[in-house]
Amino acid sequence: AVWGDYGQNLEKKPVGIYGITREGELRLLFEFPAGAVRHVHGFAPRLAGGWYIFTGDMEEMAGIYIASGDFSIVEPLAVGDQRFRAVRGYDTPEGLVYATDSSIIKNHVYLLPDEDPSSLRVLSETNGPCIYGTSCDAGYLFSTTVEPDERVRGMCSYFSTSVGPGVQTRETQLLLVNRAAEVREVSRLKKDIYPMKLMQYGSIQFASGQERRSDVVCFCRSLKGFDAMPVEMEVK
């Protein structure tokens, strides 16, 4: 298992990546220097071996890195832009398929080739930021999240129902990217009426280990008629 530091990191401290050995020992595998990234969003295994690393949040700190299997080598692939702010991604023979997680601009599903990041390709627009996804028999699922407006501060932010600029509708959108990199919408579920910061963001989350399944198990949170409900859906 590998994971990275995630927090506000207002002091712009170094950000570590950690792993557990087979003997159960915790190790620091790599450390981004102070000010390089705010935190680590996630990882995706590469078909060629090693990892993609997703970091956030703002401009120069948002990026996608390539790491060797033991994290002895970590190099930037595409950094310094909200187009490279991601949490979930999946490697394919054509490149990395990922959805952006920006609360301040319109979000998209992209295809990013390793050999030529300048050939970044838009596969689809989404209605909001994406932090959840899973692979399944039909391809790759991404779900968007109904997030609050981060410009609302203090105690008022806990009761605000205003959404961020990157959230286009008050719905969680479920998108499928098939093996041919074609995108279609599977479903949309409406956010409930309650404030997001106090009562959770509207989201669809996924169980792990569904790579070969066509019936996908997910968990709905803060969605009208589906709050705190596990759901099984057929995805073809």
What are these regions (language model features)?
Residues 33-79:
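Loop-centered beta-sheet repeat module
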Residues 201-236:
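Blade-level signature of beta-propeller repeat domains, shared across WD40, Kelch, NHL, RCC1
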Residues 1-3, 49-53, 94-97, 139-142, ...:
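Entry beta-strands of beta-propeller and related beta-repeat scaffolds
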Residues 1-24, 29:
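Recognizes the extracellular SEMA beta-propeller fold with strongest preference
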Residues 10-18, 59-66, 104-112, 149-175, ...:
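Structural motif
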Residues 36-42, 81-93, 124-139, 193-209:
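Repeated scaffold domains used in trafficking and secretory/extracellular systems
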Residues 21-25, 68-71, 113-116, 179-181:
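Short loop/turn segments that connect beta-strands within beta-propeller blades
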Residues 27-33, 73-79, 119-123, 187:
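A short beta-strand motif characteristic of beta-propeller blades
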